[in-house]
């Protein structure tokens, strides 16, 4: 067995296409369009590299990652050849090879679909720690009772500064900017504000896809000074009612990031339920000692 760095995009794509991906992290980050996946693989080849396990001149597994911030990476893989058993020891060697030349403050992130993928032994062997869970939650019916919520209003430009600060503080990576949200507002894009005592205490951004007959609560948050006061739940209830009352849709859904499953279950009271969830892990080089690569 040998660890070999790969540079041929066609070879990498071909292996991934025919591989077993039951333990592949961030599988949903692989673009469906060929030109987009070429860009991702090209970036990965440049840094930190695409690495493979080879036996008898045949590729048995591949792992790669891409940067989303300085020294922060999302790991895609491992992709494993059919009829090949990837041991935890071999995975550890493969992963250490990819990370060995990175600075001490480098962070490698993993994401696996709970209940579908196998990941625990791999995360344990490299000493990756649990980070959080992304829950994808949906509702398919409106609330049975109408809820009067006088504190919730459509967006008003007088609250732009407060909204902008709250949004950028809450969503730091790969999110629409406050101005992008403003520019998008129309019959199918709505921004609702929770205002009390003249202060913005929360907001929710709703996006309607009429072709797919679905609505996404793309962003929602409450101000840190007013957490645990039910503001988020009032916004969600309002959006749920608004979407089903005004559009012909099948479901309303949103994603929420949390470590507390009990908190997530509170959404059941609004008719939401967990559709699927992604478990997130992170590997921090500085927290793991003796990262020498086995000969």
Regions found by a protein language model. Give the residues of each.
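Short amphipathic alpha-helix that is part of the acyltransferase structural core
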Residues: 1-34, 145-175, 293-295
